[in-house]
Each structure stands twice: as C-alpha cells, then as structure tokens.
C-alpha cells in the first residue's frame, strides 16, 4: 500500500540530446519500458505520481504533468518544481532514466524522518533517488536564483556545520545500501546509447537472483 502523505515525481528532463532526442522513459530494458518499471515500483510506495518536464512535448500517459519552473537550470530546477508542485509534504524524486529502482530501497528511504533522505553510493550523493520535504523548497529556490545549480552540491553543503538552512538531512551510506543493492544495479542510469546498451546487457547477463528481483519489482 502507498504511504499516506507521500507523493512521487519523475523528472522527465529536457531534450535528451545525448540519446539522439529519444524519450528516455520510453526506452525498454529487458523488454520493459523504463517508465513502466518505475511506475510499478513507485505505485507501491507513493500516491499520487506525477511527471516534471522542462520542454514542450508529449505528456506521459496517465500522469499529471508539471512544467519545470526553472527551465535550463538542470536537475535542481526539476527537484524544486517537484517539491513545490507536490500535494504532500514529502515527495520521492527520481530521474526518468533509472530502470532498476526497488520498492525495498524506497520503503527504507521513506521510513526515515528527515527533510532530505538521500543515498550516498560509492560515486557520491544520489539526489535523483531521494525523499524531500517541503522545507527543502525555499533553500533550493535560493540556490537556483544565485546560479548554484549542481544537485550533488546541495547535500554536501547541508552537511557542513551551521550550513543546513534549517533543513534536517539523513544520508544512507554505501554500507547500508549494499543490503538493498546486492547486484549493483540501483543507480545505473541511461544517459547515452552506450549506457542503454550496457543496462540491457546487465539484465541479460545478470544472475538468476538479479533477474528474479527485477521481475518481482514489476509484480510478475
């Protein structure tokens, strides 16, 4: 059952020039569209689910569509829009190019009481698989207005002493993440044709437990 008082936003992004203009959420991984994979997971933890996009174009079937309030400001503008447009105090924000999200991880993130709950993988903070409260909106808006656009810099800044801007933050480090990501797939994204081919190969070559876990998330 979705958690009460929790929404989810999928950031559709811009023109996907590195993918030749293809709509990344419509790409298929293992024969299933990335968007369908994400919806199968998000519907089990959040309601409603809506899309945020910075460009005019086709809307995502069945989802409310919100126009990015800070176009050309990168992912941080989409994060702000998602928080500001959400009907609930807490919102899961995910990028549209992450095909391997899991219910278990999102349930863990949403169980933690903080204004920002964010994974920190081996490569750093993952601001596009995180839970934000409405309290994050105003500090993010101020950063956008002064041109501080790097999404990963946000949690780094808030972790500094006396720099939290009144926002509480909890990070989920690599040691904890391993329990939710034994096959190392969670934060694989699809930004380029190379990424797309790699993601499909990961599914094709994955172990049987990995394939079973992915299909279980889809309710198969």
What are these regions (language model features)?
Residues 189:
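Conserved active-site beta-strand element of glycosyltransferases/polysaccharide synthases
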Residues 2-151, 156-186, 201-204:
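Nucleotide and nucleotide-moiety/phosphate-recognizing core
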Residues 1-7, 193-220:
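SAM-dependent methyltransferases
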């Amino acid at each position: 059952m979705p958690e009460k008082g929790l929404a989810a936003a999928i950031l559709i992004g811009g023109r996907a020039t590195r993918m030749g203009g293809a709509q990344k959420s419509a790409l298929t991984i293992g024969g299933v569209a990335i968007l369908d994979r994400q919806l199968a997971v998000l519907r089990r933890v959040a309601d409603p689910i809506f899309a945020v996009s910075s460009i005019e174009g086709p809307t995502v079937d069945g989802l409310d569509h919100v126009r990015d309030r800070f176009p050309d400001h990168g992912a941080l503008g989409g994060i702000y829009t998602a928080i500001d447009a959400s009907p609930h105090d807490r919102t899961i924000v995910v990028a549209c190019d992450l095909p391997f999200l899991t219910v278990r991880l999102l349930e863990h993130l949403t169980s933690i009481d903080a204004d920002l709950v964010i994974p920190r993988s081996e490569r750093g903070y993952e601001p596009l698989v995180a839970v934000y409260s409405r309290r994050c909106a105003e500090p993010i808006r101020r950063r956008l207005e002064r041109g501080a656009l790097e999404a990963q810099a946000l949690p780094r800044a808030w972790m500094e002493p006396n720099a939290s801007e009144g926002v509480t933050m909890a990070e989920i480090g690599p040691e904890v993440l391993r329990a939710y990501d034994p096959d190392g797939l969670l934060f694989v994204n699809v930004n380029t044709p190379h990424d797309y081919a790699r993601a499909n190969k990961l599914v094709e070559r994955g172990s049987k437990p990995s394939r079973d876990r992915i299909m279980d998330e889809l309710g198969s």
